[in-house]
Amino acid sequence: MKEVVIVSACRTAIGAFGGTLRDMNLATLGSIVMKEAIKRAGIDPTIIADVRFGCCREPVDSLNTTRISALMAGVPETAMAATINRVCISGMEAVISGMAYIQNGFYDVALCGGMEHMSGITYSVPTARWGCRFQDQVFVDDIVHALHAGSHILPGLEQGPIKEGEIVERFRGKPYIMGITAELIAYKHGITREEIDAVALRSHNNAERATVEGDFKEEIVPIELPQKKGKPPKIFDKDEHFRPGLTMDDLAKLPPAFIGKIGKVTAGNSSGVNDGAAAMVIMSADKAKELGLKPVARIKAVGGGGCHPSVMGLSPVPAVADLLKRTNYKISDFELVELNEAFAAQYIGCEREIGLNREVTNVNGSGCGLGHPVGATGCRIMVSLLHAMKKRGKTLGMATLCGGG
C-alpha cells in the first residue's frame, strides 16, 4: 500500500457556545480552513480528488455541507466531496477514510477535516409536520437529544459492564445523556470528584498558558468577522472556551450536572458545546515527492475499537490496544499524546486502563479547556498534536478519542 503523508494542518480558534462565531454559517466556517490548508500546502486545488469532512449536525439548508464548503474554498467542481458522521470521531474518520483511498491507489490527494457549528443547532417541533391539532406541542432541543446518542431508541444502560449501583437503578430501561456515561466510568474506577476536577483544571490552565505563550499561533487560521457599518472587522484568532485564572475552588463550587447529590460530573469538568473547524491536506508520499513538497508528518498506523454505549468514553482503550497490536509499539514510545476529554472522568478512566503518562498527554489542553466542536475535534486533536510535536521537537505522537452511540 502507498505511504500517506500530511502536507498541511490548521484549525480555527474554538468558539464558545453562543460566542464569537454564533452567527457564522457552517459552510463558510468549513471553507475558511479548507482554503487555508490548500494555501499552506502550496498546491494547485485542481489536484485535489476528494474532500472529506466530519460533521455531526448539518444545517438542513446545506446537506453535504462539505461539498458547499469545498466549492466556496475554490476546490474544482470535478472533485468529489463527502460529509462524514461518526459522532465525535467524525473529523478523524474523514482523515482515515481519505488515507485508505490513497493507500489503495484510488487517488493521490485529499482535503480532509471536520467542522461543527453547535451554536446553530436548532430547536424542532417533531409533531408539526402532520398536524399539532388542538393541543400544545413542545419545542425539542436538538442538542440535548443528540447528546442522548440514540438511547431514546435503544436504552439498556444496565446491560453494560456496570450492572449495579444507584446510577444504574436510576436509569434502568431509560434513555441517558452522555454525562451519565462519565458518571459510570467514575463509579467503575472509584474516581473522586477532586481527581476529576484536577484534570479539568489542568486542561483549562494548559489552554490558557498555551494561548498566552502563543503555542497555538501557527495552527490557528484567523477569521475576519464583519462588524456594523463604519467599524473595522473583528479578528477571531484565540480560543474562547477556557476560563482564565480558574482554580480548584472555582470548580468545587459547581453542582453535579447530571445526577443530583451523588454526581461528580459538572459543567466545569465536562467538555464544552462549541463551534470550530480543522483541516489537513493528505497525499501519497510519492505525490509529495513529485511536487517537491516537504511533509509535516507521516500517518504511520491506525487502530480502532468499540465498547458498550453506557461507557462509550472508554472506547479509546480497545482502539489503542488495536493500534499497539498492529504496530508493536509500546504506549511509552509515544512522545506526545492527544486523548480528547469528552469528560475529565472519562479521560481518567482511559488514562488508567491504557497506562498513559499525563505529563505528555493533552499538553495544551483538551475538551474541558479548549472545547469540543464535535464534528471537528477528531481532526483538531491531530492538528494540535502535530504543531505541539514540531514545537517540542518530538517525532512520534498518537491522537485518539471516544464517540457516543
Language model features with spans:
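Condensing-enzyme catalytic core mediating Claisen C-C bond formation in acyl metabolism
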Residues: 1-24, 151-168, 248-314, 318, ...
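N-terminal extracellular/periplasmic Venus flytrap/periplasmic-binding protein-like
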Residues: 11-12, 23-32, 40, 156-162, ...
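Conserved beta-ketoacyl condensing-enzyme motif
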Residues: 22-110, 114-142, 220-236, 310-311, ...
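Short, well-ordered amphipathic alpha-helical segments that serve as non-catalytic structural scaffolds
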Residues: 26-42, 65-69, 94, 178-185, ...
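Conserved catalytic cysteine-centered active-site region
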Residues: 55-110, 120, 173-176, 245-272, ...
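Flexible glycine-/small-residue-enriched beta->alpha junction loops
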Residues: 109-184
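Active-site pocket-lining segment
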Residues: 180-183, 216-219, 229, 300-369
